[in-house]
Amino acid sequence: MSNPDTIIIDTGCANLSSVRYAFERIGADVEVSDDIDKIKAATRVVLPGVGTARAAMKALKDKKLIDTICSLTQPVLGVCLGMQMLTKASQERGGLSYGNSSKDCQCLGLIDTNIEQLDAKGLPLPHMGWNQISPSEHPLFAGVAEGSYVYFVHSYRAPLGDFTIAKCEYGEGFSAAIAKDNFMGVQFHPEKSAAVGATILRNFMKMNAGSFAGNHKSTQESAQ
C-alpha cells in the first residue's frame, strides 16, 4: 500500500483531527503520522500546532523529528503554532521545559524571524475570531482576494518583513503568513476559515518539491 501524498505531523496537539478533516473535505489523501520514513517520503508535509512554543518544541524533540523537518525539501505548511515553530525563536516561554525556561524558546530556525507578543494596543488578547488579510502573489494565496476573512486564535506574532506573504492588522500590523523556499506558515487556521481556508489548502495541494527547485530568493524578491 502506497503512502498518502500528504503527511500531517503528529505533534500531539489538539487540532490534528480538524486539520485532517479540512484536507479530506477537499479530497486530499492525508495521514497523521510521526513516522520519520513516511514524513520523508511524503509529497508534502503539514506541521500543525496549538498551545505553547516550548511544549511543542519539546514534543518534536522527544519524537526525534527536529532534524527530519529541517531537512525536508518538499512543501511544508505550518499552521498557527506550527508557523511560529518555523522561525528562529519565540518569546512564548510557557509550557513544559525545553532548554532554559528563562530564555526565549529556540524554534526550528527555518525562517529568519522571531515570534513576539502581539501589541494589540488595548484590544483583547488572544486575537480570536475573523479578521481580514492582505495576501501577496505567493502561490499559496492564488485566488484569495484582498480583504478576505480568515479565523485567528493567537497572542504572539511574527513581525512584517521580507518573509511576509500575507498581512493582517490587530492593534499593529503583523504577518498572517510567512514563507522561505519550500517552508510556508499561516498564523490563522485554514481549517476554520470556510471557503477561503479551503482555497489555501487546495493551493498547497498543488505544490510539490519541483515548485521550489532553484528558488532561493526572498518572498518579496520573487514577487517583484
From Swiss-Prot:
Identify the species of origin.
Shewanella loihica (strain ATCC BAA-1088 / PV-4)
Q: How does it assemble?
A: Heterodimer of HisH and HisF.
Source taxon at top rank = Bacteria
- Give start and end of each Glutamine amidotransferase type-1 domain: 5-214
Q: In which pathway does it act?
A: Amino-acid biosynthesis; L-histidine biosynthesis; L-histidine from 5-phospho-alpha-D-ribose 1-diphosphate: step 5/9
**What InterPro entries does this protein map onto?**
Class_I_gatase-like, GATASE, Imidazole-glycPsynth_HisH
Under what name is this protein listed?
Answer: Imidazole glycerol phosphate synthase subunit HisH
Annotated keywords? Amino-acid biosynthesis, Cytoplasm, Glutamine amidotransferase, Histidine biosynthesis, Hydrolase, Lyase
Known SUPFAM superfamilies for this protein?
Answer: Class I glutamine amidotransferase-like
Q: Which GO terms describe its biological process?
A: L-histidine biosynthetic process
